């Protein structure tokens, strides 16, 4: 076993960790074997050094090895998630996109937690709607099979996250746990859209996904946002057959108008709940509908639907039908049975 001191000394010298060192470090973290002051300094050292794809992949495996198992789902399973920490406090776009994608017929396992650095995390929102976020894994699997949608609350599957919650709250900044969150979905989706908070993270995240054997994925950075943007360019790394292709898309590629970031500002969970409810009922603002649609359109690429304009139009029609709220309502009802 590698000593914590030797790992910490390397980090304080801003040296990269080996796979084994990173695995051991995150095993210590998730088992609550690191004191709070040291936790914060380790997280800051990693942030200053910049995390490597090897460190991230090792951390993912350490966290998976300490996670409650989720029963395997047959066929394709999608994940759509952002790292958070983009600082703009937008409405919960990836959560809404997951509900819309499920309504469109794609099985989506949405993994996440409560807010750390924003006003409203994905599961703050879901709780405000009345979703039982601590549904047993076998029930969540059945919910996925019935309604194409399942919600997996991170602390429920890995109670070790309670050991690092205080450090993350104290730091009030993005840490490696923002990066790890999207990668440790216990349902192990084989098709994922991951939004990152920095352009510098696109390639390390994509390389990590290749290392983890993910079938198809896109990593996106939306000019300040951790999702596909409707205000400016979105930088993309797409993974197929273990190859990474980098490109850039803009709102015009989706056939939509360009909006401002402020058009997507959210608020407290209750305010976000009302905004999201209106979108799902087919009564949302154009900017809100567009933001959700482009993210689902990007997910559809992973199912060999390459025409982003056509994808976006199909999704907008589904949103405007109001059917998406029925999907959420069915999941709420099922989760509280």
Swiss-Prot record:
Biological process terms in GO annotation: L-tryptophan biosynthetic process
UniProt binding sites for anthranilate 2: 168
Binding of 5-phospho-alpha-D-ribose 1-diphosphate, residues: 82, 85-86, 90, 92-95, 110-118, 122
Binding positions (anthranilate 1): 82
Keyword check for Nucleus: no
Domain of life of the organism encoding this protein: Bacteria
Keywords associated with the record: Amino-acid biosynthesis, Aromatic amino acid biosynthesis, Glycosyltransferase, Magnesium, Metal-binding, Transferase, Tryptophan biosynthesis
Residues that coordinate or bind Mg(2+) 2: 226-227
GO molecular-function term, one example from the UniProt record: magnesium ion binding
Annotated EC: 2.4.2.18
UniProt remark on cofactor binding: Binds 2 magnesium ions per monomer.
Listed cofactors: Mg(2+)
InterPro entries: Anthranilate_Pribosyl_Tfrase, Glycosyl_Trfase_fam3, Glycosyl_Trfase_fam3_N_dom, Glycosyl_Trfase_fam3_N_dom_sf, Nuc_phospho_transferase
Gene Ontology cellular-component terms listed: cytosol
Catalytic activity reported: N-(5-phospho-beta-D-ribosyl)anthranilate + diphosphate = 5-phospho-alpha-D-ribose 1-diphosphate + anthranilate
Binding site for Mg(2+) 1: 94, 227
Disulfide bridge positions per record: none
Biochemical pathway: Amino-acid biosynthesis; L-tryptophan biosynthesis; L-tryptophan from chorismate: step 2/5
HAMAP family in UniProt: TrpD
Quaternary structure, from the entry: Homodimer.
Assigned protein family: Belongs to the anthranilate phosphoribosyltransferase family.
Function according to Swiss-Prot or TrEMBL: Catalyzes the transfer of the phosphoribosyl group of 5-phosphorylribose-1-pyrophosphate (PRPP) to anthranilate to yield N-(5'-phosphoribosyl)-anthranilate (PRA).
Protein's name in the database: Anthranilate phosphoribosyltransferase
Protein's organism: Francisella tularensis subsp. holarctica (strain OSU18)
Lineage: Bacteria, Pseudomonadati, Pseudomonadota, Gammaproteobacteria, Thiotrichales
């Amino acid at each position: 076993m590698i000593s914590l001191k030797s790992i910490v000394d390397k980090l304080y010298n801003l040296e990269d960790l080996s796979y084994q060192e990173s695995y051991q470090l995150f095993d210590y973290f998730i088992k609550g074997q690191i004191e709070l002051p040291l936790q914060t300094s380790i997280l800051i050292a990693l942030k200053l050094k910049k995390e490597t794809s090897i460190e991230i992949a090792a951390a993912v495996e350490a966290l998976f090895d300490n996670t409650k198992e989720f029963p395997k789902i047959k066929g394709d399973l999608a994940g759509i998630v952002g790292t958070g920490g983009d600082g703009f406090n937008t409405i919960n776009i990836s959560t809404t996109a997951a509900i819309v994608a499920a309504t469109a017929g794609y099985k989506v396992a949405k993994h996440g937690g409560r807010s750390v650095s924003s006003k409203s995390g994905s599961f703050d929102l879901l709780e405000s709607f009345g979703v039982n976020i601590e549904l047993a894994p076998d029930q969540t699997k059945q919910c996925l099979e019935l309604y194409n949608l399942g919600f997996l609350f991170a602390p429920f599957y890995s109670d070790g996250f309670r050991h690092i919650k205080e450090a993350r709250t104290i730091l009030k900044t993005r840490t490696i746990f923002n990066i790890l969150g999207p990668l440790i979905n216990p349902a192990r989706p084989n098709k994922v859209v991951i939004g990152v908070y920095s352009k510098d993270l696109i390639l390390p995240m994509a390389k990590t996904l290749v290392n983890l054997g993910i079938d198809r994925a896109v990593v996106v950075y939306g000019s300040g946002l951790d999702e596909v943007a409707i205000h400016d360019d979105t930088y993309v790394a797409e993974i197929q057959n273990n190859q990474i292709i980098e490109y850039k898309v803009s709102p015009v590629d989706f056939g939509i108008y360009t909006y401002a970031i402020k058009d997507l500002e959210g608020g407290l969970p209750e305010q976000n709940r009302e905004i999201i409810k209106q979108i799902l009922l087919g009564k949302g603002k154009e900017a809100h509908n567009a933001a959700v649609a482009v993210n689902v359109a990007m997910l559809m690429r992973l199912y060999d639907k390459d025409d982003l304009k056509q994808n976006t139009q199909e999704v907008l029609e589904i949103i405007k039908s109001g059917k998406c709220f029925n999907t959420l309502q069915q999941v709420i009802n099922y989760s509280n049975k």
